[in-house]
From Swiss-Prot:
It comes from the Bacteria. This is Protein translocase subunit SecA. GO terms for molecular function: ATP binding; metal ion binding; protein-exporting ATPase activity. It is a peripheral membrane protein. It comes from Xylella fastidiosa (strain 9a5c). The gene is secA.
Amino acid sequence: MINSLLTRLFGSRNERQLRQLNSIVAKINALETELQKLSDTALQAKTTEFKQSIQDGKSLDKLLPEAFAVCREASRRVLGMRHYDVQLIGGMVLHLGKIAEMRTGEGKTLVATLPVYLNALAGNGVHVVTVNDYLARRDAAHMGRLYNWLGLSVGVVYPGMPHSDKHAAYGADITYGTNNEFGFDYLRDNMALSKADRYQRGLHYAIVDEVDSILIDEARTPLIISGPADESPDLYIRVNRIIPHLTRQENEEAEGDYWVDEKGKQVHLSEVGMERAEELLHQAGILGEEDDSLYAAQNLSVVHHLNAALRAHALYQRDVDYIVRDGEVVIVDEFTGRTLAGRRWSDGLHQAIEAKEGVPVQRENQTLASITFQNLFRIYKKLSGMTGTADTEAYEFQSIYGLEVMVIPTNRPTVRKDYPDQVFLNRSSKFNAVLEDIKDCAQRGQPVLVGTTSIEISEMLSEHLRKAKVKHEVLNAKQHEREATIVANAGLPGAVTIATNMAGRGTDIVLGGSLDTVLAELDPDATEEDRFRVKTAWNRRHEAVKAAGGLHIIGTERHESRRIDNQLRGRAGRQGDPGSSRFYLSLEDSLMRIFASEWVQKVMRLMGMKEGDVIEDRRVTRQIERAQRKVEAHNFDIRKNLLDYDDVNNEQRKVVYAQRDELLDAESIKENIDSIRHEVIDALVTRFVPEHSIDEQWDLPGLQATLQSEWGLHLPLIEMLKGREEVDAERIAFLVQDAVDKHCAEREASIGAETMRALEKHVMLTVLDQGWKEHLATMDYLRQGIHLRGYAQKQPKQEYKREAFELFSEMLEHVKREVIASLARVRIRSEEEMAALEEQERRQVDTLLRQSQFQHQEAGGYGTGDEAVSLQRQLAGQGAAIAQVIRDTPKVGRNDPCPCGSGKKYKHCHGLVT
């Protein structure tokens, strides 16, 4: 109550901050008249003047009013667009390193030019991050005209571009690209073998467009560079043939071989199913001996393949989670509906789906480098973002990224009507209502955008509309090449557009169609009269659509996140235009079935509803939103959990990458190598000649043999020590050190000091990279089973940190030993051989990177993970008796009437006891 009173008196934090920024807007506006009087040359010269001021010590904050005013005036002259006051506020929010929530159609792309221009003046490079390559190239080309006019260079990075072009793009003042490309290049730079091979020049300032999509939706997707492993894919094909012979259970307690946990996205074999699977695996010749258990230690890889195959068949649907195109399985992003070409699910899931679909199964991949988007974007010294929907995730932005969300007011009031949800008993009734609504809009000349959650539904609706002879367009992952054209025409009178979540984010749907697109299609020789005629026709269409009610949004299903629903609604009602939205739901929808169906079903039963009847009640909508909040909270917990674990990896990643940077920047690492060599020799001698030990405990033959086998050094220690008195471990260490130092000095003299320095750097980099790659694989294995420590009353995260530290320390010690051993073994006779070796290694890395892939690594869901179930099954396989509960009465729901006849709900009666 006190908080609400204070808010009424002083305004919310958002309102107070907006008032402060409005005072700076007044300063910017005061400069406009003077700047309008300047010639183009004088206005362009302001950029040089600003750069000099920065070199003289002036801060960007002090420059902000004048720099924003210059950018606005330049935009008016070059692009024909002048920033509104609210857009100036949005620009300031971005410069301050915050997230600006701006509604669809408020000109986010134009807003970004203000902080981009100001921060690019510092000369450190600004990265503008977009959700796809099309938007990166479009914005770089369109806004590049403004930046180039102001004397700043612009580059764009995209997959597969030539090395020289990418170097130039990162060398520009402003670089556009996708989150994937910036992340991939960051990892690739940290695999480079020389400074010249690196692209990026540090991560200083980034503006992330559609920040919620990148920092929230994709936060559970680590970016992974992987190369093919050695294992044959044949086992996936053989295991896949077994799955159709297993029976799915309706629920955990029904008969069958496996049951599906849709909330947790897991599939579990029953006891009967485990026996049946073992029998089938024996018949297929995959398991050997008759008494060979599926969960015996030697068969763990078979368990891995079986789990992957079960998930592929039970959880992943074609044209929903993936499509098959040109003989390949291509992932469909669950949040955007776009295809993710080149990306693969990890843990053998992708191979299992390939086997299921009968396409060539590619080899599993080994992780070479990885980073989550969470940790990638936290590397930037300053980060900001824009989106139309961030406020629902404000807590996550603040707690994970330290980013505050500010809601920017619209330039004109929003007049869109959001109608209550309509809820039906089944999908067929729902889709009948959707089709009727679409036909009604088309007849009245009102454009309609239909949002679907999958390609399958979009194509099903398309088929029904085709039969009804309703002209329409489909925008999904299969037609993404025509995205810009479809979106440009989606606002035409009576246009019907069916879209998956992708829905053309980044491109406004203009009522009456896109005027710019129509003008661009005119003949280059078109007269002003032709252009006027086109504009007049567009104005008529624009007014006709407004009179029909503007763009109407139909949602065919609620998404797990309210934010995705709001994004769909936000397509209508841009810049004060009319518009409307309505969601059609059924009890068979995923969200309703899993999270919200029980309460709504009871309401429907009480109302005596039958097929075709509909509920339209705000209380139902609120109940659904409550379910969405639960899912959002659960997904936040998963992302936070992922970050907690990845933070451990991140600290290690920072150490390794910092070490690589030092190696690449150093002219010579001779002192480091000498220090490492002495440390390694001391450890080696201690291993065979322990300190404070007696002669009988020494293993001089073992030490001598190790020096010979690992380092190629013949040192007759036993003969050297014969007849000497008072020989101890310290004396032996001195003799070995001296012999090794002389051996290294002789090698350096034979090949030359310069070649030796190059060899030392090359070996150190190569061994460090190999050690890090193997360490990543070890960490993956550790992480997969670490939660089982909970059974031993231990805290899994603390155990993970402890073991990760031990593994990392072991890896560093191994790298030291291997570096010294490699330097002793490698035979280089000339500078030319060294150059050839470096070139060969560089070609291998280039080839590896060309073959590398992005991978999705799915985070776990509700309930117990696969590994915990596997442990339980292992115990069963080893003869541990697990009692099976047999239910002799029907299961009673918590909110059902108690069977005792009291009339109370079960949870308030006998349910209290259980």
